[in-house]
């Protein structure tokens, strides 16, 4: 959700900070309109979206709003159709272990993960999708990071180091 983003933006600017506005969204495995429960952890995937400019902020608000209005099923969900429609001005990160790319990697499905990463790069454009490295000392995460490094070398998709933090 993006509640409070305007107050946050104004206060950051007042303090001389250039804020980066964004949101972690839930991506439905198929359509945001689906109301069927899929098994296990694959009910939705995490994806980080950051507004690159004013157009990106406008598109981000549309994506998030439509996730609530059209895709709400236990959680507000978006889908790749929506991301394709409103991708301009948005930078996307592959997210944590709950992201689609990482989920495939933890299941040993490297080629499917790579295909998914390339699909996100196609949606957001080269230079606007990043593979997200995190290290919280979790063995599974360290394994995923090694595979993301390999994927970077094979695809040229850039890496970004982050931490799984949430601002409320």
Predicted ranges, named:
Residues 1-168:
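Phosphodiester-processing cores and adjacent nucleic acid-binding clamps
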């Amino acid at each position: 959700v993006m509640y409070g983003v305007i107050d946050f933006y104004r206060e950051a600017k007042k303090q001389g900070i250039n804020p980066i506005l964004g949101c972690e969204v839930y991506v439905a495995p198929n359509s945001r309109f689906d109301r069927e429960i899929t098994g296990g952890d694959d009910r939705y995937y995490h994806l980080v979206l950051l507004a690159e400019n004013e157009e990106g902020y406008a598109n981000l608000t549309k994506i998030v709003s439509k996730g609530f209005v059209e895709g709400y099923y236990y959680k507000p969900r978006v889908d790749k159709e929506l991301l394709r429609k409103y991708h301009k001005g948005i930078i996307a990160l592959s997210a944590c272990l709950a992201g689609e790319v990482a989920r495939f990697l933890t299941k040993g499905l490297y080629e499917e993960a790579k295909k998914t990463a390339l699909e996100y790069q196609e949606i957001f454009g080269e230079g606007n999708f990043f593979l997200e490295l995190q290290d919280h000392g979790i063995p599974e995460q360290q394994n995923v990071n090694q595979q993301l490094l390999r994927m970077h070398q094979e695809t040229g998709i850039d890496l970004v180091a982050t931490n799984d933090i949430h601002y409320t």
